[in-house]
């Protein structure tokens, strides 16, 4: 450096001060690049993963709902690569969330149900019942620990990660998070306060990461719009003018409540000048059709193989990096882990079956997506086929649904297993009599007309593809 500075002095006698200044800047910059490359290294992408809970795919302003107010989600959609025809792999919270965090199907990560098996005649609130439940949940937690997770993979590249909201698999560290709110309860204990009482834990975590110059992943999975549907009275009053059902008004109100928290997060990123450095990802864990005359969900939504339980918009936003726009391609929550890893400069493991949604060639080349639905309470924690209710796939305009009882090769005694679990007779009869279903979801988005009988060759072709995918 000293020799260069002496040369700079000779330039001073022969040239203008402006020229000298320019040469000095070049010398200093070259020295810094040589000695301190970390000063000019590109910043790593941060990730904010937003997961709503029990949310129907059409209940957003940007998806065309005429009553539900979602201005902040609408903004996110405008600024995102939007996939309105997204799907989750399973229509139940626990297995769906496990897929999002691992990038693997439920039959791969083995978390197929919400709760572990029950024993005939043993209530969960009895000492024996509680022991069975705790032991079963521990086995489910171990399954997750044995599967690489998104936070664990990011940690290898120096990322800090923060779990908030819904989290079923024990202490947050068991999922690979470096920090978190959940200590081990079924839904998420302390984590469930996020979005309902405060957003401050997220702001504090991000500030901590900035102070330590660490890239971060935030898992924001509030129990919203999931029940209890208890929005503020003014919101309920507004929606009461739009529907005769108080239950629907409260559900819609919880969606608006969730939307406001999304606005809080986007505004926070703007204030902290983090928007361009942060990939924002949105998905819901499963669908929901609110019952009109009682709390709870209506048929053909949660826990079902229909779009009311499976479909979700998926959004990816990073201003200056991702071009906003809309894609009508069918995509899946199985794609989120490889997409996030790729956006962070990390090669996804070959074992992940999803595609990078930011690679248009891979999105358009894929011809079908797959999924599976299981019982709410497990029958067997080690063998996914024991809990299977339906397998399904989407290829082009067609959606195939295959009940477990319709496939002897996969599940010969499904009905007997259901009977052993003491399901009510009407449910067992309905399941035993289930048939293969085929829907043209482009022309029949509500899946009302089963075309399976009139298209036997198509059903046969799709069944072969579904069987080739299903490898428990």
Regions found by a protein language model. Give the residues of each.
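Short, structured active-site-proximal loop/turn typified by the sulfatase FGly-forming signature C/S-X-P-X-R
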Residues: 65-97, 103-109, 160-162, 463-471
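Polar, surface-exposed loop/tail segments
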Residues: 70-71, 100, 166, 276-277, ...
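Histidine-centered active-site microenvironments of extracellular/periplasmic hydrolases
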Residues: 68, 268-325, 332, 353, ...
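C-terminal, low-complexity/hydrophilic appendages and adjacent surface loops
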Residues: 303-308, 375-452
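Active-site-proximal N-terminal segment of extracellular/periplasmic enzymes that hydrolyze or transfer
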Residues: 40-81, 90, 434, 446-457
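Active-site His/acidic residue clusters
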Residues: 202-251, 286-299
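A short beta-strand-to-alpha-helix junction
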Residues: 65-69, 87-92, 117-119, 139-148, ...
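Catalytic-site neighborhoods of secreted/periplasmic enzymes
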Residues: 104-204, 299-301
């Amino acid at each position: 450096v000293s020799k260069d500075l002496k040369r700079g002095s000779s330039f001073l006698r022969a040239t203008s001060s402006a020229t000298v200044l320019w040469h000095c800047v070049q010398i200093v910059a070259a020295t810094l690049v040589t000695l301190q490359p970390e000063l000019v290294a590109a910043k790593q992408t941060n990730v904010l993963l937003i997961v709503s809970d029990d949310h129907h795919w059409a209940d957003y302003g940007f998806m065309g709902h005429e009553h539900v107010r979602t201005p902040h989600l609408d903004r996110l959609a405008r600024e995102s690569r939007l996939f309105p025809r997204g799907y989750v792999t399973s229509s139940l919270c626990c297995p769906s969330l496990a897929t999002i965090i691992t990038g693997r199907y439920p039959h791969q990560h083995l978390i197929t149900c919400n709760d572990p098996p029950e024993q005939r005649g043993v209530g969960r609130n009895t000492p024996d019942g509680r022991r069975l439940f705790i032991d079963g949940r521990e086995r489910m937690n171990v399954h997750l620990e044995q599967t690489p997770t998104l936070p664990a993979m990011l940690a290898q590249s120096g990322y800090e990660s923060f779990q908030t909201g819904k989290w079923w698999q024990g202490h947050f560290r068991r999922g690979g998070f470096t920090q978190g709110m959940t200590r081990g309860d079924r839904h998420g204990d302390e984590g469930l306060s996020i979005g309902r009482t405060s957003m401050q834990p997220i702001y504090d975590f991000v500030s901590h990461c900035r102070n330590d110059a660490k890239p971060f992943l935030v898992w924001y999975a509030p129990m919203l719009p999931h029940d209890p549907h208890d929005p503020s009275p003014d919101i309920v009053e507004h929606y009461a003018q739009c529907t005769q059902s108080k239950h629907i008004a409260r559900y819609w109100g919880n969606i608006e409540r969730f939307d406001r928290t999304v606005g809080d997060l986007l505004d926070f990123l703007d204030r902290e000048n983090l928007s361009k450095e942060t990939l924002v990802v949105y998905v819901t864990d499963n669908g929901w059709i609110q019952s009109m005359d009682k709390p709870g969900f209506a048929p053909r939504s949660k826990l079902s193989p229909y779009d009311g339980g499976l479909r979700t918009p998926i959004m990816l936003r990073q201003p200056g990096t991702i071009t906003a726009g809309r894609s009508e391609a069918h995509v899946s929550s199985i794609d989120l882990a490889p997409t996030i890893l790729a956006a962070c400069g990390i090669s996804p493991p070959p074992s992940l079956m999803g595609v990078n949604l930011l690679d248009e060639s891979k999105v358009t080349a894929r011809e079908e997506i797959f999924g599976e639905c299981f019982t709410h309470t497990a029958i067997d924690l080690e063998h996914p086929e024991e809990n299977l209710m339906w397998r399904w796939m989407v290829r082009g305009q067609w959606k195939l649904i295959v009940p477990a009882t319709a496939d002897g090769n996969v599940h010969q005694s499904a009905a007997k297993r259901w009977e052993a679990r003491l399901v009510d007779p009407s449910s067992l009869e309905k399941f035993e009599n289930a048939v293969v279903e085929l829907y043209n979801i482009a022309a029949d988005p509500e899946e009302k007309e089963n075309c399976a009988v009139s298209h036997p060759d198509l059903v046969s072709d799709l069944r072969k593809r579904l069987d080739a995918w299903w490898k428990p």
